[in-house]
Amino acid sequence: MKILIPGGSGYIGRQLSASLVNDGHEVVILTRGQRRAFPPPLAGEGQGGGLRDVTWDARTASGDWVDELAGAQGIINLAGANVGSGRWTRRRMAQILSSRLAATSAIVQAIETTPADRRPSVLLNASGIDYYGNRGDDIITEDGEPGDSFLARMSQQWETAAMKAEPLGLRVVRMRTSMVFGRGAPAFNLLTLPVRLFVGGPLGSGRQWFTWIHVDDIIGLYRFGLENERLSGAVNAVAPDIRRQVEVAKEIGLVLHRPTWFPAPALLLRLLLGTQSQLLLEGRRAVADKAEAAGYRFQFGGLRQALEEILRRR
């Protein structure tokens, strides 16, 4: 199977590409830089798979990358500026949004120029569980109403851009992803750092619901979506064991043998982070109904199980 991964040089893209290549698939990373997304040994020989980088500008449907679409079976679109990098000034928020919309629009335009009988059959497009905004104690399935925060509006517009591939004959999966837990995962490293430094604890009230997913399961869901036509539309990429933030901090502390009694008041976080504080203070009790109904089985469904695998692994 030949798979294109725009934005595949980030954390999830690297893990996903390695998994696909090791199982014999051909992976083409679309990257804006000239440097390889992986050191050569990571590409591996697998069972006949391969890994290539192809340059694109992530804005226009032109260049050699467009030719790669013909004969590919799927596209996994991860392209977009890092949400967690840099303070959210107006300029930065505009960049976060425009980078996603421009890249996705370019992909859809390129699909349209590809002969219908040579087009990929599926587009798996990243999105965020923040789509739903701050929802308190409501249990949220994929049919939940969208929120009105910056991240919610961004996710809505991103998904709308991706859905334009449906009239072109592609099955579109919108992967509403929660915080990815994994060894070396940037957001997870930031989450656990205060606990490691003995200053972990509740963020704001700590009662906001905290959704998460182990890196092996976000990879598993993307691969499941590639291969299973039963999965389409919005998918909540969240582990079944949903906790309040204060409970997550406590579990991290138990695994790391650290106290978690040091609170970070909401007012302080808003003063320090501005709009970006919504990443820490807003919560949603989202459940993975659609993925589980389609037959996906989580490898790391429990919070303690996931934390021990990541934090105690040598």
Outline where the language-model segments fall:
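NAD(P)H-binding glycine-rich loop region in Rossmannoid oxidoreductase-like domains
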Residues: 52-103
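Conserved Rossmann-fold NAD(P)-dependent oxidoreductase catalytic core, especially the SDR/UDP-sugar
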Residues: 93, 105-149
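Conserved beta-loop-beta element that borders a ligand/cofactor-binding pocket
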Residues: 127-128, 160-183
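Glycine/proline-rich active-site loop of Rossmann-fold NAD(P)-dependent oxidoreductases
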Residues: 156, 180-190, 225-235
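A conserved pocket-lining segment of Rossmann-fold NAD(P)-dependent short-chain dehydrogenase/reductase
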Residues: 190-217, 221-224
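Mid/C-terminal beta-alpha module of Rossmann-like enzyme folds, strongest
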Residues: 225-275, 308-314
